[in-house]
Every structure is written in C-alpha cells, then in structure tokens.
Curated annotation (Swiss-Prot):
Swiss-Prot/TrEMBL keywords: Chromosome, Coiled coil, Differentiation, Metal-binding, Nucleus, Phosphoprotein, Spermatogenesis, Zinc, Zinc-finger
Binding site for Zn(2+): 250, 255, 276, 287
Gene behind this protein: Zcwpw1
Domain notes: The CW-TYPE zinc finger mediates its binding to trimethylated histone H3K4me3.
Keyword hit for Isomerase: no
Alphabetized SUPFAM superfamilies for the sequence: Tudor/PWWP/MBT (SSF63748)
Expression sites (tissue/organ): Testis (at protein level). Expressed in thymus, brain, lung, ovary, oviduct and uterus.
Superkingdom of this protein's organism: Eukaryota
One Gene Ontology term, aspect cellular component: XY body
Biased amino acid composition, Basic and acidic residues: 26-40, 59-81, 141-152, 514-527
Record has Zinc-finger as a keyword: yes
Protein name per its UniProtKB record: Zinc finger CW-type PWWP domain protein 1
Length: 630
C-alpha cells in the first residue's frame, strides 16, 4: 500500500507538471459562456437558459476525470511518447550499412544497364551484373528507385563514360567479391559509348550547320565512316602527317570492330561499305579475328573523316568549288579545330589549295567534299574564263598529287614546300604571277633600265674616260690637225670650209649680201662659239692660228642649228671645190655629237659677255683677211 501511495503521489506530481497547460486552457475558456450570456441579455426563452447550464455541467465533468483519472491518462501518453522514438529507432536499425551499399550498387548497375541498352551492338554480349552476383536480390521498391535512376542517367555520352569508370572502380574495390569485367569487354563498351557519342554529335552539328536534319542516307554514311584519328602524345612532324594512328570501323552489323590502318592510306578514299576483309593488314583482315588491343583513353580520340594529305573539294564565298589538300596549319600546328572543348567532331579543317597561287584557309566541315564525290562538269561551270584556266591547272595538280602516297603528297604539295619553291626558282609559275601583278617589281625594272641608260650616257659624256673623249672632240678634228700639218693654217681652213659646206643643201649666196648676213651671224655667233670653247681644249689650243681657224669654221653656212652647225656664211666659191676624205667623214660625227653639244652649251652659258664681244671683233677681222687672201 505504501508503495502504491508513493507511486500515486509521483503520478500526481507528474500530472501537475505535465498537464498544467491544459488546465490553464480550461480556466481561460470559462469566460466564454459568460460572454455568450452577456451578448444575449434579452433572451428569456428556456432554451437559452438551459444551454449555459449544460456547458457548465460539461466543464465540470471534464475537470473531474482530469483529477480522478489523471495519472492513468498521463501514463498512457508517456508510453505513447516512449513508443514513438522506439519505433523510429527500430526503423533506422532495420537498414544496415551493408544493405545500403547493396542498394547503392544496384542503382548504379541499373543505370549502367540502361546506358548499355542504348547501343544495339552490345546487347548480345552485355553481362547481367545481377545474375553474376549471388545473394543480391533487387528490392521490392523498384518503382521508388526509378525516379532517382532517371536523374542519375546521363544525358550526354561523356557523363556516361565517366560514370562507367567510377562504377568499374567501385566494383573492383567492393567488399562483396564481385567479378571484375575483362579488359576486352571494357574496351568494347568504351567503343560503343564513343559510337553513341559520335551519333549525338553528328546530329547536333548537322542541325547547327545546315539548319535541318540530314537525310537517312547521310546518317548511315556517317555511321559507317567512323574514322577515328588518335592523336599521340608526341607533337606532329614538320611534314604535317604527325604521329597519329588511324582506326576504321567495320561496316558489317555482326562485326563492327575497329581496325587500325597501317601505312600511308587516305581514309577519305575508303568506300562506305568498308569491311575487315579490305584491311591490308593480314593479321586483322577477317571479322572473326578479335579486335586489336589499344591502351588509350576516350579523350585522345577524335572522329575526323580527313587526315593530312586527304584530297578534297573546298568551297569559299565568291569562289567555285576548288581542289585542295588537308594539311596542318604552319602557325598552329593543327589541321582541325573543335567548336568547343567538349566536342569530338571537328568543325573546321585547314586546307591548302592547289593551283598556281599558293594559298590556304580554314574551311567548315559542311563546305568540304571528297574528291571523288563532286563531278568535274559542275565544277567547270564558271563564267569567268580566267578562273576556268586556273581551275583546270589546279585540277591537274590534284590528279598529280593523287598518284603519290599520302606522305609524299604532303611533302611535295604542302604549303611550305610550294611557297619556298616559288621563292627560290626564278622560272616558277607563282613567282611570275606575283611579279606581273606587283607594281613594285615593274618600277624596279624601269629604274634598273634608266640607271643603265644613264651610265651609258655618262660614259659618253665624261671627258676623263678614254672612250667618250674622241666622241666629244670630234667637232675639233680640223683644229687639232692644223699644227701637225704645218705652221700655215690656210689649207686647213679650206678643208674645214669644204667639210661644213658639204653638209648644207642651200644654194650659194651672192657675195654682196654677205655683209648683212655676216651681221646676223655675228649676233647669233656667241652660242656656237661657246660650243667650241671647252675648258680642256682651251688650255691645249695656245696658237693664235688655231683660234682663227675655229672662228672661221663657225662662220660656215648650215641649214639649221640642230646639227650643231653655225649660221650661213658668205662663201659662194667654196662648193665648186671637190671635197676631201676628211670633209666626207665629218658630218656623221657632227650628227652624233649634236645632243652633247646642247648640254655643253648649257654649261658654258655663264661665260662673260665681254669675252664674246672681243671674239666677235677678232672673227670679223680674220674673215676680211681671209677674203683678201683668196
């Protein structure tokens, strides 16, 4: 009894602490009926009076059980509160760590299976991980796990490949003893994923570039022509071919194995229905032979349809389809570019064009075609005749390049080899075109020709040189021969007069009119007189007889001053005398020296006028003396 009383007191204490708020709520609710009575003071009906009494009775009844049966209800509520965490703990304890790992691996395996199911070529050899793993049963809540699987399933093949690597690493290090897949199967799965990735990228590029989906035939062609070019860690050689390995996939649906092309083979020339039996390698020329092992990663693979040396047709804006060759850019060292770092399909190729002019450019993939695809008739439909001739030369060069191997093709018809060859060879076609179109080269040629002409003229004009000296002194031959012949200069005077008169075609003038003509000749005389007064010859001519001889020669009649001759003189009897050999040889010399005499006249303009007047007086006196002697 004492124990029961103690427990009863403890329950009362517990009820007081636990159920204090509900009692306060009940006390706070008591004014509500009074307020309800106050709101309706005018209601005197018996129903209105009985309702408050009923409320009071109900409140009293509620208070009694709380006091009388309070410990029992409090105990029940405590038990309920204790049962709830116990249930939660029981629920948490039901899922162990091993079970959690199993569920996690099952989810990953299901996502991997869904990725593998997308590729049809893997369905017949795909291993079922659930069958291989004994003791792992898929849970009954597959529908609940379906939503997370949809989220985990990758949208892009690249994420699927990374997820596959994580799953393989986890499966290799798992504690459940799961068997690790063989390397050949793993590589096959990787290739199937790469194939799926290529399909997705092909569709994406075609939609972006063409603005429409390609036809079914083109899609099949793209799937069949899976030429993967694996770029090695080493850099490309200067030739442009580089250290790359070319792989081609068999078109047979039962095989679809990747075969490595050895040797200088252009993959763009291969047919669409290429199979293993067309492989030149005898070790891998059948479909039943397993695929060659390859130790590489997916990031090193680029799905390129062309390699350095592939001959193609390229189209640029404003130009017709033009033959060219795929070659590495000499500046970048690459021959294709990607639109983004996530792509595995090149968006542009570097093309070196064939033809007389050496040129290169980056061309989009949609503007490239194989050399065998485009007909020559469509290409040659060009309105410009000049471009037609250049196009024919380019096509001929492409045919010559087609006859060589892919490695020799790059070395012989590459950009640098043709560009350097055009610079070195003087007879190169490219050099002749550049020189004909370049105005600077024409100016250089003209300048060289002018310099050569000036040098020749200077050689003729320069008195110090031995060669031009007789050419400049030819008009003074009679004067130089005077002192050598003898002291008397009269015979030489006559010969000089004869030689100059022989040049003139004007009939002899009467003697009476000679004075007037002499006056006119004296006015015009200083110009031809200066012509014969060269500085070098002045010093040499010291005799007075020679000076008289020169002055008399200047008086001889000539038709005009263009030949370096003097005005007409008054000598009517001279033409009746027979000319000598010296006189006959003199006119051509005078003709040759006419241009030189004009320049000499310009140099001697600065001589004083007084000297010219003194010479005019002396010449008039000598002329009279000569007339008296005759």
């Amino acid at each position: 009894m004492m124990a029961a009383l103690q427990t009863h007191k403890e329950y009362e204490k517990g009820t007081k602490k636990t159920f204090a708020p509900p009692t306060q709520k009940l006390h706070s609710e008591k004014p509500q009926p009074s307020s309800w009575k106050e709101d309706a003071p005018g209601t005197s009906s018996p129903e209105a009076e009985t309702k408050p009494s009923l409320l009071k009775a109900s409140l009293k009844k509620e208070q009694k059980p709380t006091t009388e049966h309070g410990p029992n209800r409090g105990q029940e509520r405590k038990l309920k509160a204790q049962d709830q965490p116990a249930k939660k703990k029981g629920k948490e304890r039901t899922l162990t760590s091993a079970e959690f790992e199993e569920i996690f691996q099952i989810v990953l395996q299901k996502s991997l299976q869904e990725c593998l199911e997308t590729s049809s070529c893997v369905q017949h050899i795909r291993p079922t991980k659930l069958d291989e793993e004994p003791g792992i049963v898929p849970p009954a809540t597959d529908k609940k796990d379906a939503d997370p699987e949809k989220v985990i399933t990758p949208d892009t093949p690249k994420i699927a490949s990374s997820l596959e690597e994580e799953v393989n690493s986890e499966m290799g290090t798992s504690k459940l003893g799961q068997p690790v897949t063989e390397p050949s199967k793993k590589k096959f799965n990787r290739l199937s994923l790469s194939k799926q990735k290529k399909k997705a990228e092909d569709e994406k590029m075609e939609k972006i570039q063409d603005g429409r989906e390609c036809s079914l035939k083109e899609k099949q062609k793209i799937v069949i022509q899976d030429q993967s070019q694996i770029r090695g860690p080493q850099k490309e050689e200067e030739s442009g071919f580089g250290h790359c390995v070319i792989w081609v996939q068999c078109s047979s649906p039962k095989c679809e194995k990747w075969r490595q092309l050895r040797g200088n083979i252009d993959p763009s020339v291969l047919p669409d229905d290429w199979s293993c039996d067309q492989n030149p390698d005898p070790n891998y020329n059948r479909c039943d032979i397993p695929e060659e092992s390859w130790a590489g990663c997916e990031s090193d693979v680029a799905y390129a349809s062309y390699v350095p040396g592939s001959i193609i047709w390229a189209k640029q804006y404003g130009y017709p389809w033009w033959p060219g060759m795929i070659e590495a850019d000499p500046d970048l060292g690459e021959y294709f570019l990607f639109a983004s770092h996530l792509d595995s399909l090149p968006s542009k190729y570097h093309v070196t064009f064939f033809g007389e002019t050496v040129s290169r450019a980056w061309i989009p993939v949609r503007m490239l075609k194989n050399f065998q695809e485009l007909s020559l008739e469509l290409v040659k439909k060009c309105k410009n005749k000049n471009s037609n001739q250049k196009l024919e030369a380019a096509i001929a060069m492409a045919h010559r390049a087609e006859q060589t191997s892919i490695q020799e093709r790059v070395n012989l018809f590459g950009f640098w080899s043709r560009y350097n060859g055009a610079d070195i060879s003087e007879e190169g076609e490219d050099l002749t075109l550049c020189e004909s179109n370049n105005p600077e080269s024409c100016l250089e040629k003209e300048e060289k020709d002018l310099e050569e002409e000036k040098e020749e003229e200077e050689e003729k004009k320069d008195p110090t040189l031995p060669r031009p000296k007789p050419a400049k002194m030819q008009t003074k031959k009679p004067k130089s021969r005077g002192p050598a012949g003898g002291p008397d200069g009269t015979p030489k005077k006559k010969t000089a007069k004869k030689s100059l008169v022989s040049e003139s075609t004007v009939p002899p003038v009467p003697t009476l009119g000679g004075k007037e003509e002499q006056g006119n000749s004296d006015l015009d005389h200083p110009v031809p007189k200066k012509k014969f007064k060269a500085p070098e010859n002045k010093t040499s001519a010291t005799n007075l007889s020679e000076e008289k001889e020169i002055k008399i020669v200047s008086k001889c009649p000539t038709p005009s001053a263009q030949h370096g001759a003097c005005p007409l003189g008054k000598e009517g009897l001279v033409p009746h005398m027979p000319p000598t050999q010296e006189a006959a040889s003199f006119p051509p010399d005078d003709d040759c020296s006419s241009d030189l005499d004009l320049e000499q006249l310009m140099e001697d303009i600065g001589e004083p006028e007084e000297r010219g007047e003194m010479q005019q007086r002396g010449s008039s006196e000598e002329f009279l003396a000569a007339l008296f002697e005759e």
